[in-house]
Amino acid sequence: MFFNIFLLLLKLYSLYNQKFMIELAGIVILGIIAQWVAWRFKIPAILPLILIGMFVGPFSTLFTEDGTKLIEPIWNPQLDKGLFPGEGLFHFVSLAISVILFEGGLTLKRNEVLNVGPVIFKLITIGTIVTFLGAGFASHFLFNLSWPISFLFAALIIVTGPTVITPILRNIPLKKDISAVLKWEGILIDPIGAVAAVLVFEFISVGKGTEYTQQALVEFGKTVVVGFSIGFSFAYALYFAIKKNAIPHFLMNVVSLSFVIGVYVLSEQFAHESGLLSVVVMGMVLGNIDLPNIKELLYFKESLSVLLISILFILLSANINMQDLYLIYNWNTLILFGCVVFLIRPIGVMLSTINSGLKTNEKAFISWVGPRGIVAAGIASLFGNRLVLEGEPGAEYITPLVFMIVLGTVLFNATTARLFAKISGVFLKESTGILIVGASNISRIIAKYLQKNGRHVVLIDSNKENIERAKGMDLDAEEA
């Protein structure tokens, strides 16, 4: 009898594993197909990824025989179906986002912000406050949500993600300062938005009033201190380990990956949501010091990020339910989207760029481009589900509204950014680009002259000292 029960359990376990394997393999394959489609048609990959996730998730319930999803990301014991038990999906999402943001941090070079550093700082401070207040008020009055739920939604859409900004910048030749502003904002604002969302979430779940507000300020300060301290410390620990040949070349990439995951988890033990800040700081430090084989590390992390982004967006999109979509199927949703894109974002950018030296057309383009990405989607799914289970009124609106903003801004920017760049005059024509081989003194003088006359110049050289001098003159220079 016991042997028969054991065989039955083994058979059920085997069937579950087969389902898990098929669904997971399907997600990976569909994700890579979506990435290829995005490359082929020069659109951000997030767009086809979300559409695929919706198709195998909520939309599939309209045509499956039993009315269930083709892919159910979270295990449902009633349906005997699902990939991740409990909050396993969200733990996976958190770790994956840490790797993605680390890769983004590696690409941030300090020479890029020589002219626009103050603008970036204001965008992630003043711009954040404008978005937080504007989106909070808009969602409250349009959907009659409670103030805490409204401002949780607002905190979640503060972020403009590198997962979306990078493909747009790759496909549109822009002036250096504009690209730098959008790229740095997209990466640095992610941890800020995550921390803001956590503070509002804790306000809803744990405590309210002046006492909690004071505690929230302390927690915010703690998050910043922990994030910077651990990020800097482990960045230099990894740097010296590689520099002293303590890590063999063939293990460098995987050891770096383990550092990223370890730093994220360690940082989270000291301060909630400080992990994202830690990995961004770690990436920034490593990207701006003389780290051997940095390009190889960057290529590895970039490939890994592509895979993780593909999996994440399909899983998170598939996790939405049809009843969530019906909730926001009205004109108020369109009005909210219009407020975020055409009112709140431009106001935030204009206030952040006062006396910045940027031209009006450059400010207009930065205002136009503000797509949301994986951090907004991931945290919205986590907090939305938790608050729904706790019975918080209006919590069911959080996930669909955030996904509406993510999908809407991506679709909007993917289809209009290139055209608006041309209309606003920030688009660099291909014929204006000049490549100079060698970054010697005479080459730098010529390049500077051409740059002042409106030409886009790039210098390449194998000499690191020449490259640094060129970058010090605000020239685009790459190591050969």
Give each language-model segment a name.
Residues 2-433, 456, 461:
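Transmembrane helical cores of multi-pass secondary ion antiporters/exchangers
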Residues 426-480:
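Structured cytosolic domains appended to multi-pass membrane proteins
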